[in-house]
Amino acid sequence: MNIFAAFEERIGEALATLTRAGQLPEGLDLGRVVVEPPRDPGHGDLATNAALVLAKEARTNPKALAELLAAELRQDPRVTEASVAGPGFLNLRLAPEVFAEVVRAALASGEAFGRGARRPGLVNVEYVSANPTGPMHVGHGRGAVFGDALANLLAASGREVVREYYINDAGAQVDVLARSAYLRYREALGDAIGAIPEGLYPGDYLKPVGRRLAETHGRALLREPESAWLPVVRDFAIAAMMDLIRDDLAALGIRHDVFFSERTLQGGGDGGAVGALIAELREKGLVYVGRLPPPKGQLPEDWEDRDQTLFRSTAFGDDIDRPLLKSDGTYTYFASDIAYHASKVARGATDLIDVLGADHGGYVKRMQAAVRAVSDGRASLDVKLCQLVRLLRGGEPVKMSKRAGEFVTLREVIDEVGRDPVRFMMLYRKNDATLDFDLAKVVEQSKDNPVFYVQYAHARTASVFRQAREAFPGEDLSPQALAGADLSLLRDSGEADIMRLVAQYPRVIEAAGSAHEPHRLAFYLYELASAFHSFWNKGKDLPQLRFVNQTDRKSTLSRLALVAALRGVLASGLGILGVTAPDEMR
């Protein structure tokens, strides 16, 4: 039950009534009408921008239109107050029974509460896609958690989702990996390798790879020229690194449906899938040979003063056309990326989401242009950029890892603080804002630690039910039974706050999913937990407000119904974020 969607529909009906009465013109576009919680809860339970966005089209001023709507909505028995604020916002206050009905719906629906109906179209979410050259670092972890939670959120909002990892196994970096692993192979055989040469990967994580190479090949590779041993070592090292990455992802509870190899795009004759894609774009008139003018300011890496094979990305909103071939005749990264995204479209994706590091900002327009081109406008791409993570301990920067050589590994952080703090705190800030992750603060047991505060609320709901079972042995305390409780007894402002927040859950799922912003759900869960803790504390001072009162069965069952609804929402929301909902805090 989504009261926000219900009142969007009700406002549409009210506008239709006003149109039939001749007070508004026909054909108003309601696409921008929104019903949401007011910024100040003191203004009401719902707010709508309908008058503001429709006034021009309706040839009237926003306040006058808002007053017309308010008069119409006051006739709805669910509305106890309709008031106009500011330039034309319409605020509604609803009857308590509306929220009681939401609580009953939450109890009856169980895990389905807040979930959206299945919608058409396939969403492909690509996330992590870390180069297979070493263990994952904390920055990778942020993108991994964001992508995984976003995929969960989209599924909860009714979308069919494919979770994908792109293995960058065809670039120069994997040759560097092979040479680095070969050095560790020689070391495992007893060679003195000295300092790791500049340009190779220095971390200790390649020592086990070198040992396994020695166990598998003995000294045979030492007798081979680089042209012979490099592909052997490269394949071996890539497989070892992907095993390492998969282990790191599993430790964080991250899953993928598809691992897509870049190499598969370049195999076969005529340049493989990349060559075929360029030929297809050429037939559409979207590939030509030309010379790019020098851009103003700093020259980008892919600009060269020569005739080049170019993609007409400006035809789809990009700033400049983009090269597809390097001067040595090999494909640019962009060419491979176009072919890869064309593969996603060919596999049925209509909505593509790439979760990337903040350093990929220049990539966005060109790839959005490419997706529009290869899909003939049937698919779209949203690129979500994840900013840096600053790792701190008690406010001080954390030193690099010896194992990784240049950074702190994700696994080290998970092993120290646990999966739940990593996941929740990675989502408790918008993805495009730099995140300070303090290893000391995320394990504090205080209100200032959001993951503890939300999980503690869920654990407290479990303790309420343990207490209730002791006080009322044999009482059916299932959600289905509690749905029959007399919710009109929930008259305290703290109870009303919790009911309003429970009612917002379906809209939070819908809005956060549409915006591709899982942090909204994390913020909401903290607000819901805060309302619950506040009412819990009220009961310490006022015994009549305690959740369990052995001398007042009716009030107890009413409050237990509210707690059960809240508990279900906390568990559901934490599940979408990939965080556990504990019954006890240890």
From Swiss-Prot:
GO cellular component assignments: cytoplasm
UniProt keyword terms in alphabetical order: Aminoacyl-tRNA synthetase, ATP-binding, Cytoplasm, Ligase, Nucleotide-binding, Protein biosynthesis
SUPFAM superfamilies the record matches: Anticodon-binding domain of a subclass of class I aminoacyl-tRNA synthetases (SSF47323), Arginyl-tRNA synthetase (ArgRS), N-terminal 'additional' domain (SSF55190), Nucleotidylyl transferase (SSF52374)
Subcellular location: Cytoplasm
Catalytic activity reported: tRNA(Arg) + L-arginine + ATP = L-arginyl-tRNA(Arg) + AMP + diphosphate
Residues making up the signal peptide according to the UniProt record: none
Protein name: Arginine--tRNA ligase
Record organism: Methylobacterium sp. (strain 4-46)
Lineage: Bacteria, Pseudomonadati, Pseudomonadota, Alphaproteobacteria, Hyphomicrobiales
Gene name of the record: argS
